[in-house]
Swiss-Prot record:
Belongs to the V-ATPase D subunit family. One of its GO terms (cellular component) is plasma membrane. It comes from Pyrococcus abyssi (strain GE5 / Orsay). One of its GO terms (biological process) is proton motive force-driven plasma membrane ATP synthesis. InterPro entries: V_ATPase_D. This is A-type ATP synthase subunit D. GO terms for molecular function: ATP binding; proton-transporting ATP synthase activity, rotational mechanism; proton-transporting ATPase activity, rotational mechanism.
Amino acid sequence: MPEILKIKPTRMELLKLKRRVKLAERGHKLLKEKQDALIMEFFTIYDEALSLRRELIKKMEEAFEALRRAQVDVGSLRLKEISIGVKPNEEIEIRTRNIMGVRVPLIEVPELKRKASDRGYAFISTTSTVDVAAEKFEEVLELAIRLAEVEESLKRLGKEIEKTKRRVNALEYIIIPRMKNTIKFIEQHLDEMERENFFRLKRVKAILEARQSM
């Protein structure tokens, strides 16, 4: 006999166990639906992450090429002086949103693309190549922040998928089969008890009839 639960083999326990099996099967169905929905959401975001990563690589190549041109145009020393005068970007705000019960980051980013005058180096003589390089790196920063949000979402969804999968498997391969094996065991036990009682009563009846015929 496969592994069973340690409970009394009574009719009351049998009824309770049958109710528990129904609840467990309902729970398994809901968890499986959640797991499937999470996996679909995961791959939707995964596709977005791949697209963002490709775009980020392209933008980084463009940004470093623009930086190289700016260095050629104004020189490394002047470029360093200009960079010292650049104002920092506004702070980003990180909130969360809910995806199938999973809290994932929602990064609210202020406008990162700025006019040359807003960058803080307007007082220094610059050229269009410097402005182009600055603009390209602002685009890189926007994409990098978005990619960070998406990749963290993937990480959290992946953890939840694994957690849900473990629960689904536990119900499907351990808990529900164990309860069903126990139900089968109790039913067999009760049938055996019933047969024994039947033969016992039959024997008692035969003894009583034999005594009455004397």
